Amino acid sequence: MDDNKPKSNTFTDEGRLPQVEFAIKNVSRAGTIIGYVCSDGVVLMGVNKEPTNGPMEKIYQLSDSIYCVLCGLFGDAMELKRYARIKAQEVLERFGVECPLTTLCKFVGQRKQAFTQYAGTRPFGVSFLYAGVIDGKYALMSTDPSGTSNRWKGMCYGENEEAINRGLKNDFPEDEMDMKTATVEILRLLGKARELGPKEADRLEILHFSKDCKKYLPCDEVLKLLEEIHAK
């Protein structure tokens, strides 16, 4: 091995961390995930590379009040999902209250960041979008492979993320939409960035998250929405 070759946890002469950049690039090639904050909740959406006839592969419950959608290496994602659930349960058992969204994102972000600096490790190749509540208001947060945590109105990771994020920022109305309207608009935006017709209904996972209800849209309901959009 070339001892002069930069290790995965050291900076290059240009001040870059190549392995972190590679991990972020890997996420940008994975199945698309989108989150959007609405007047009555948060929409989480995931696009699978192949049809899914079994359990959800993109959207997961982390606690009674926090759900997530993930993008990147599946094994890495399952490890971080397990870690997040454990930390959320630890907070509940120790303090008797649900783990706040910001706190859980901090825990996951710190774990991700630690793997960018320890020798013999590599970054987690996965990004998460989290739906929850902050100070009584619906919120969408993220953690990326570097461990950075952010709060968003709308955000996308994965394939076609640049075009979709541009659309979320520039094409969506400033006024808040309800989850039903936002779901249709997100599907329209997704359809502009990639092929998306009724035959892709079984590749989509959609969650409507609110304080009172967490609803996974069944495939036949997603199919109906895509047929209506495709007909216009």
From Swiss-Prot:
UniProt KW keywords: Cytoplasm, Nucleus, Proteasome
Keyword Cytoplasm: yes
Recorded superkingdom: Eukaryota
Pfam families recorded: Proteasome
Ranges that cross the membrane: none
Keyword Cytoplasm: yes
GO CC annotations, alphabetized: cytoplasm; nucleus; proteasome core complex, alpha-subunit complex
SUPFAM superfamilies, alphabetized: N-terminal nucleophile aminohydrolases (Ntn hydrolases) (SSF56235)
Localization, UniProt: Cytoplasm; Nucleus
A biological process term (GO) from this entry: proteolysis involved in protein catabolic process
Subunit structure and binding partners: The 26S proteasome consists of a 20S proteasome core and two 19S regulatory subunits. The 20S proteasome core is composed of 28 subunits that are arranged in four stacked rings, resulting in a barrel-shaped structure. The two end rings are each formed by seven alpha subunits, and the two central rings are each formed by seven beta subunits. The catalytic chamber with the active sites is on the inside of the barrel.
PANTHER family, sorted: PROTEASOME SUBUNIT ALPHA/BETA (PTHR11599)
Family: Belongs to the peptidase T1A family.
Function: The proteasome degrades poly-ubiquitinated proteins in the cytoplasm and in the nucleus. It is essential for the regulated turnover of proteins and for the removal of misfolded proteins. The proteasome is a multicatalytic proteinase complex that is characterized by its ability to cleave peptides with Arg, Phe, Tyr, Leu, and Glu adjacent to the leaving group at neutral or slightly basic pH. It has an ATP-dependent proteolytic activity.
Protein's UniProt name: Probable proteasome subunit alpha type-3
Gene that encodes it: PRE9
